[in-house]
Amino acid sequence: MSYVDAHFDRDSDIIRVVERKDGKRDFREYQAKYTFYHEDQRGKYKSVYGDPLTRIVCKSTKDFRKEVAINRDKKLFESDINPIFQCLSENYLNQDAPKLNIAFFDIETDFDPERGFADPSDPFMPITSISVYLQWMETMICLAVPPKTLTMDQAKKTLEGIENVMLFEKEGQMIDTFLTLIEDADILSGWNSEGYDIP
């Protein structure tokens, strides 16, 4: 079992981890642990400098903050460690990295001869096509709404013999299909996606 990503829900003190196991995505939840150490002459733990330390483990943000406040006059160690890293080191140390599912995509929009291309803040023109390469399937798929100059039948006839092209009557249907195709992607990468496709 190897992890892909993790999210820390501070409100519920739960760490949600996404794993890949046998090529499938799996979701796990762990109770957050807030661990830190403080100087204590009777402590059972040692710092890297040999100082005796006591270990404090809390299961909620509230308790953690309270314990840090109680011990604020002592020298603290590891009180700034994110609970996600603690969880990952306890549960996934020395695990192999997963084979990530990567999807590459590009979105094309219609063009208005008078106004030009639509800006993401004012998307006045519809999406006309989305191409997506699913690396884990080694498959390129093109989703498109036929141009206004062709009927659906004419567009289908034009595409005869070309694999992995899907035509749609409406932009919304095409977007729904795209979202379904990328559902199992761990990483999404796109051409000009940050500045335009996904503003």
Predicted features by range, described:
Residues 1-199:
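The two-metal-ion catalytic cores of nucleic-acid processing enzymes
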